[in-house]
Curated annotation (Swiss-Prot):
UniProt cross-references to InterPro entries, sorted A to Z: Questin_oxidase-like
Family listed: Belongs to the questin oxidase family.
Practical use: Notoamides have been shown to exhibit antitumoral activities. Notoamides A-C show moderate cytotoxicity against HeLa and L1210 cells with IC(50) values in the range of 22-52 mg/ml, but the IC(50) value of notoamide D is greater than 100 mg/ml. Moreover, notoamide C induces G2/M-cell cycle arrest at a concentration of 6.3 mg/ml.
GO MF terms, alphabetically ordered: oxidoreductase activity
Pfam families reported in the protein's UniProt record: Questin_oxidase (PF14027)
Key words of the record: Oxidoreductase
Species annotation: Aspergillus sp. (strain MF297-2)
Protein name: Baeyer-Villiger oxidase notM
Keyword Phosphoprotein set for record: no
EC numbers, comma separated: 1.-.-.-
Primary enzyme class: oxidoreductase
Function as written in the Swiss-Prot or TrEMBL entry: Baeyer-Villiger oxidase; part of the gene cluster that mediates the biosynthesis of notoamide, a fungal indole alkaloid that belongs to a family of natural products containing a characteristic bicyclo[2.2.2]diazaoctane core. The first step of notoamide biosynthesis involves coupling of L-proline and L-tryptophan by the bimodular NRPS notE, to produce cyclo-L-tryptophan-L-proline called brevianamide F.
Coiled coil (residue ranges): none
Length: 402
């Protein structure tokens, strides 16, 4: 069997993505390989120096997993490549490609992310930097078993400014392990972030892309650490804890959850590291919730939503509609993550502890419809999404839902 080099893209029918509903047409995998290889060989991982991540791989792979064909894949690529920068001289990407070629991608991830050496600890934290982009990218690479995309994700992590999240993670973990704070359901911790004056007011619109670093991690570090440390997963509850994190991410509608579903299924990753992956993701979600103004979470806003463009659509129809939207991949990632969340969360939505899972039943589809209805028009992401849902200023361009 030919071993795939870390500079090559070669998708196969054996790995075509989570939350898939329909098969892809003939020729889809071949075109996806061509587009992803072109992106890998031609474009910078950042289209601007701060807060500008290349989303082409995310978009193409999401559309592929959602059953899109050549037309939809070309749309996804064309919507993303026009503003990309050419590749510069590379260090991190070439380093991780050579390491993967020599050792294999699983061994490289074990060494550089999970070995608990000082370097691995720094890299593990860095996976969550840049609004989660490195771990999202890594998740795509593992999901589709593509060493080239795994190398890109590791290079993403290695090249990001830490932004003080390493201090936040380590302090939260130390406090959780001390036994001095009780474990609480994640949905209650979101409520605590909003009730606490310091965490609720720590974020500032004017902090821009540094809203987390200069917001809760600067103005309310002690408070957000204390709250975040209370999300704790027992070894026997990893599946439930993952579902709880995904459910609350959907409730807040601000954090993508897909990589967790991929990573917790990797038996070659030690159980304690898989638990850590989910705990850190949920804790960072709480910090980002504070950074974005801790908007009031009201279930009635979801259950009472009346779909517009998506009225009457079920998941199959919604997938098809999303694949045709001009976008850089955010709405496709969002909708696929919700469909995956529906599946992962379902076993825990009834019975003991069900209150920890606010999103239930058809609310998963309803949130996906909200996402599609409000982002289907236009190209500019600044007009598609509310950047800071807890700030009144961020809603000025948005019509009242009532």
């Amino acid at each position: 069997m030919t071993i795939l080099k870390a500079s090559q893209v070669k998708l196969t029918a054996r790995r075509t993505g989570l939350a898939r509903l329909d098969p892809s047409p003939t020729g889809t995998l071949e075109l996806a390989n061509e587009l992803l290889q072109r992106n890998h060989d031609s474009y910078h991982m950042y289209f601007r120096d701060v807060g500008g991540h290349n989303h082409i791989a995310h978009s193409v792979l999401s559309v592929l997993a959602m059953g899109g064909g050549p037309k939809e894949l070309n749309r996804a690529y064309d919507d993303g490549y026009g503003y990309q920068r050419p590749l510069p001289a590379l260090n991190f990407l070439h380093f991780f490609e050579s390491e993967i070629d020599a050792k294999g991608w699983q061994a490289v991830l074990q060494e550089y992310c999970f070995s608990r050496t000082p370097l691995a600890e720094a890299m593990f934290s860095q996976l969550y930097e840049g609004l989660l982009h490195p771990i999202i990218h890594l998740g795509f690479g593992i999901e589709f078993e593509q060493p080239s995309i795994i190398a890109e994700g590791l290079a993403h992590a290695a090249s990001h400014d830490p932004g003080n999240i390493d201090t936040f993670f380590l302090r939260s973990e130390e406090l959780a392990r001390s036994g001095s704070v009780p474990a609480k359901p994640l949905v209650e911790l979101y409520e605590e972030v909003r009730r606490n004056e310091k965490t609720r007011t720590a974020g500032r619109m004017q902090d821009g892309p540094f809203r987390l670093r200069d917001g809760p991690l600067a103005r309310s570090m002690d408070e957000i650490v204390h709250i975040a440390a209370q999300f704790q997963i027992k070894p026997e509850d990893l599946e439930r804890g993952t579902a709880e994190m995904i459910n609350c991410a959907a409730y807040s509608a601000g954090r993508r959850s897909g990589p967790a579903s991929v990573l917790v299924k990797q038996s070659w990753i030690k159980l304690e590291d898989r638990i850590r992956l989910v705990e850190w993701k949920a804790r960072l979600d709480l910090a980002w919730y504070a950074a974005n103004g801790a908007a009031e979470l009201r279930l009635e806003d979801i259950s009472g939503y009346e779909p517009t463009a998506s009225k009457g659509m079920e998941w199959h129809a919604l997938y098809k509609a999303v694949n045709e939207v001009h976008d850089d991949g955010h709405i496709a990632k969002f909708v696929r993550a919700l469909k995956n969340g529906e599946t992962v969360s379902a076993p825990f939505e009834q019975g003991d502890g069900a209150d920890a899972f606010p999103i239930k039943g058809d609310l998963w589809l309803r949130i996906a419809q909200m996402g599609y209805d409000t982002t289907k028009d236009g190209h500019d992401n600044s007009d598609k999404w509310v950047w800071g849902a807890g700030f009144d200023l961020a809603w000025m361009k948005v019509p009242d839902s009532q």
